Swiss-Prot record:
Task of the protein: Component of the large ribosomal subunit. The ribosome is a large ribonucleoprotein complex responsible for the synthesis of proteins in the cell.
Species per Swiss-Prot/TrEMBL record: Gadus morhua (Atlantic cod)
UniProt subcellular location: Cytoplasm
Similarity comment text for this entry: Belongs to the eukaryotic ribosomal protein eL22 family.
Protein's name according to its UniProt entry: Large ribosomal subunit protein eL22
Subunit relationships: Component of the large ribosomal subunit.
Pfam family, one: Ribosomal_L22e
Length: 125
């Protein structure tokens, strides 16, 4: 007797949600969250095409200085980090800010920690 195949149910649509916390640079006035949101809308690629966001498949929302990206298609958190770094480089902020994952679904923009004391010690030796 042949094995009986079980019918598989339809997969639920998986909605991915990632957040980017730009609080510190926006408060200090070195970065504009609205400009960054516009950059993401222009650069995120869906099906190999940038700028269209897949007709509502990917959505970007901004609340104060936090930007959230919601996607119904497979979307990499790493890709979001790549685009963020590209934006920082374009605006000459890459030397002061870094992109750090603070939770599984979010990134945060932090300043590099530069220890003044260590630099002074190395300069005098």
């Amino acid at each position: 007797m042949a094995p009986v195949k079980k019918q598989g149910g339809k997969k639920k649509k998986q909605i991915l949600k990632f957040t980017l916390d730009c609080t510190h640079p926006v408060e200090d006035g070195i970065m504009d969250a609205a400009n960054f949101e516009q950059f993401l809308q222009e650069r995120i690629k869906v099906n190999g095409k940038s700028g269209n966001l897949g007709n509502g498949v990917v959505s970007i929302e901004r609340x104060x200085s936090k930007i959230s990206v919601n996607s119904e298609v497979p979307f990499s958190k790493r890709y979001l980090k790549y685009l963020t770094k590209k934006y920082l480089k374009k605006n000459n902020l890459r030397d002061w800010l870094r992109v750090v994952a603070n939770t599984k679904e979010s990134y945060e923009l932090r300043y590099f920690q530069i220890n003044q004391d260590e630099e002074e010690i190395h300069m005098t030796s």
